[in-house]
Regions:
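Extended polysaccharide-engagement surfaces of secreted carbohydrate-active enzymes
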Residues: 78-218
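Aromatic-lined, polymer-binding surfaces characteristic
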Residues: 1-83, 108-117
């Protein structure tokens, strides 16, 4: 299938849920194989799922892929999914600006993205993830979501999904709560916060994808 990882993960998670709803073991088996692979092979060491390669992230769309792994865990309780969610939480909590928007400097598809409501329940397995979910929600544009993927209707649907699957528990501080923090990725990129200033640096070299209208040079 020639498509992006977030699409492929959405197809697989829809097949998984459909398999449980309609009692189709073959659907469950096929989707489980795909989503388990997303957990153990397709995720980069820094916690993201690259859209074109593992050489760098696609910050906004990564929320979509994360959501499908979170759904997969809810139905399978695969421990590898839990590990993948931990890595994803670490990635997103570091690479989110103080206003809740994902860092665009390292993004190879979108220069700007709104505050995402996708997959907060995936973060909610962990104390810092629950705090991160609350942080994102606090920046949701209550007068109308015109910037994130899908706009109002998509975000409202994702909020409902978060309510359905959310894991309550204690919270722990995240980088946005700190006066200063710095984080370096395994690839040549990182972020630093000093007071009210946040600076992201990137030396990512990702080869251009031929005839791909969605690719942005980093």
């Amino acid at each position: 299938i020639i498509t992006s990882p977030n699409h492929y993960a959405i197809y697989a998670s829809a097949l998984l849920v459909g398999g449980h709803v309609f009692n189709k073991p073959d659907w469950i088996k096929m989707s489980t194989k795909v989503l388990h692979r997303f957990c153990v092979q397709e995720q980069a060491a820094d916690g993201y799922w690259g859209e074109h390669s593992q050489a760098g992230p696609t910050t906004g769309y990564d929320y979509l892929t994360l959501t499908q792994i979170a759904v997969y865990w809810e139905y399978s309780k695969d421990p590898e999914a839990h590990k993948a969610l931990r890595r994803s939480t670490d990635f997103h909590k570091y690479f989110t600006y103080p206003d809740g928007t994902p860092v665009e400097t390292i993004n190879d598809r979108n220069r700007h993205w709104g505050v995402s409501m996708w997959g907060h329940f995936g973060f909610s397995h962990f104390p810092d993830g629950r705090r991160y979910a609350a942080f994102l929600t606090s920046h949701f544009p209550y007068d109308g979501d015109l910037n994130s993927y899908g706009g109002n209707m998509q975000s409202f649907g994702r909020i409902a999904q978060n309510v359905l699957y959310y894991h309550e528990g204690k919270t722990a501080p995240i980088p946005q709560d700190m006066v200063n923090y710095a984080h370096a990725m395994k690839i040549p990129a990182g972020i630093r916060k000093t007071g009210s200033w946040v600076v992201t640096y990137s030396g990512i070299i990702a080869p251009p994808v031929s005839q791909n209208n969605f690719f942005l040079d980093r």
